[in-house]
Amino acid sequence: MLGNTELLLRILADVPPAGIVEGAYLFAQTEPNQQSVFVAGRELIERERVHKLLISDCRPKSGYIGAVAYRRAMIESGIPAGVIEEVPMEPTEILHTQIESQRVVRFAEAQGYRRLIVVSSPFHQERAFITMVTAALRQYPSLKLYSVPGAPQPWDEVVTHSQGTLQGTRAELIAEEQKRIEKYTIQGDLLPRQTILQYLRARD
C-alpha cells in the first residue's frame, strides 16, 4: 500500500528533467477535459521545457474530437502551431490509452527520442503514465518518461471519459480509473505498480 502511495505521488509530482526534452505527448481527451492538457502543454512550451507537443493523428472517434479539431483548439488556447506534431495511429477502429501509448513509444523510438513527457488530465494521469511506461519497457526500454499532470479542473463537474462512454464527476472517475488499473494489471496489459515504481527509482 505504501508503495502505491509513493508511486501515485511520484506521478503527480514528478521531478522535471534537466534541459529541453524532445517532446511531450498530450493524451487524447474528451472535449470537457482537453483544456487541462492544453494548459500544461502551453506551460511546457512557454518555459522552454519541450521542443514539441505530440497528439494523436486520429480522426474523430472514441470521444476524441480528432486531430484537426484538437490542433485548432490547441492553437486557440495559445499554443504555437509550429510546435504541434501528430503521431501516426490510424488506421484504428477505436482509440484508447494502450493504443496511444504503444504508438507514441514506437514514434519516439523511430524519431530517436531519449526522453518524453507524459501529460493527461489529473484523474487519468496515473493510468496514462503506467500504460506509457509499460509500453516503453516492452518496446523501447531506454526511453526515459516523465510525468506532468494536466491543469486541475472542477472535481465536481460531470464530464464524459473513457472513449466517451463513461460519465460522472471527475472525482467519481478516480475510482473508475483505479478499477481499470487493477483490471488491466491482472490481464497483463499493464505492468505491476511495483515495477513502475522501480522504473522511476532507477530512471535518473
Report the location of each language-model feature:
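A structural signal for short, hydrophobic/glycine-enriched beta-strand patches
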Residues: M1-H161
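A conserved mid-domain beta-alpha-beta active-site/ligand-binding segment of alpha/beta enzyme cores
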Residues: P91, S162-T165, T169-D204
